[in-house]
From Swiss-Prot:
Gene3D superfamilies referenced in this protein's UniProt entry, alphabetically: ATP synthase, F0 complex, subunit A
Organism encoding this protein: Shigella dysenteriae serotype 1 (strain Sd197)
Function recorded in the entry: Key component of the proton channel; it plays a direct role in the translocation of protons across the membrane.
InterPro entries membership: ATP_syn_F0_a_bact/chloroplast, ATP_synth_F0_asu, ATP_synth_F0_asu_AS, F0_ATP_A_sf
HAMAP family tied to this protein: ATP_synth_a_bact (MF_01393)
GO biological process: proton motive force-driven plasma membrane ATP synthesis
Record carries keyword Secreted: no
Name listed for the protein in its UniProt record: ATP synthase subunit a
Stated family: Belongs to the ATPase A chain family.
Length: 271
């Protein structure tokens, strides 16, 4: 176990605590005595998500500036493969005309993948540095295991769904879609509104919770292995799970991207 002074329950609970800032006092929250208030922010999730987003921009910009028509390097080849894969997915699933969808899909796929990839770091590495070097009370390094992050991303997708729906169908067409489907009669407007409203709202909710649930479960398994087993036996389970987890983090990034494209394609369809 990583800490001899903690029980397994304390160890697991410690690694599930976020580094929070109380916006009323601008002071760090004590994980052992959190305030019962809405006005807190998970600054570790904010730091790592923004940092990884900037890393994505810097890497792709540097490759774009150094791109040549000759024989590309290994890193440039890998980037081109990712771009080609995402662009092909967009062409297959999005049938409207928009210059935003392909860059958006690429950003979502790479950004979510990088956030998920943080789950493969040794579970005690950064939290130990944060606690013993920086004096921080807690630290979680996987932004996509924070429901606030995943639902915020899903909210952004939801706003785009509304934007494309109104842009392609107009206010009247969008309103008619909500009130006159699936039953095309004025008497069923309340029923249609409930059904279509639930269907519309379920898209961002399921999108965000799916990513959160899978990444939270993956993070929890790593914590359980480290917290319940002696150090010399952790590798027996850690290595196979880490190898399998590479598939999970890639698949979850792909699913988030695909569902975003599909939802925006549905919103762009004219009826």
């Amino acid at each position: 176990m990583a800490s001899e002074n903690m029980t397994p329950q304390d160890y697991i609970g410690h690694h599930l605590n976020n580094l929070q800032l109380d916006l009323r006092t601008f002071s760090l929250v004590d994980p052992q005595n959190p305030p019962a208030t809405f006005w807190t922010i998970n600054i570790d999730s904010m730091f790592f998500s923004v940092g990884l987003g900037l890393l994505f921009l810097v890497l792709f910009r540097s490759v774009a500036k150094k791109a040549t028509s000759g024989v590309p390097g290994k890193f440039q080849t890998a980037i081109e493969l990712v771009i080609g894969f995402v662009n092909g997915s967009v062409k297959d699933m999005y049938h409207g005309k928009s210059k935003l969808i392909a860059p958006l899909a690429l950003t979502i796929f790479v950004w979510v993948f990088l956030m998920n990839l943080m789950d493969l770091l040794p579970i005690d590495l950064l939290p130990y540095i944060a606690e013993h070097v920086l004096g921080l009370p807690a630290l979680r390094v996987v932004p996509s295991a924070d429901v606030n992050v995943t639902l915020s991303m899903a909210l952004g997708v939801f706003i785009l769904i509304l934007f494309y729906s109104i842009k392609m169908k107009g206010i009247g067409g969008f309103t008619k879609e909500l009130t006159l489907q699936p039953f095309n009669h004025w008497a069923f407007i309340p029923v249609n509104l409930i059904l279509e409203g639930v269907s519309l709202l379920s898209k961002p909710v399921s999108l965000g919770l799916r990513l959160f649930g899978n990444m939270y479960a993956g993070e929890l398994i790593f914590i359980l292995i480290a917290g319940l087993l002696p150090w010399w036996s952790q590798w027996i389970l850690n290595v196979p799970w880490a190898i399998f987890h590479i598939l999970i983090i890639t698949l979850q990034a792909f699913i988030f991207m695909v569902l975003t494209i599909v939802y925006l394609s549905m919103a762009s369809e004219e009826h």
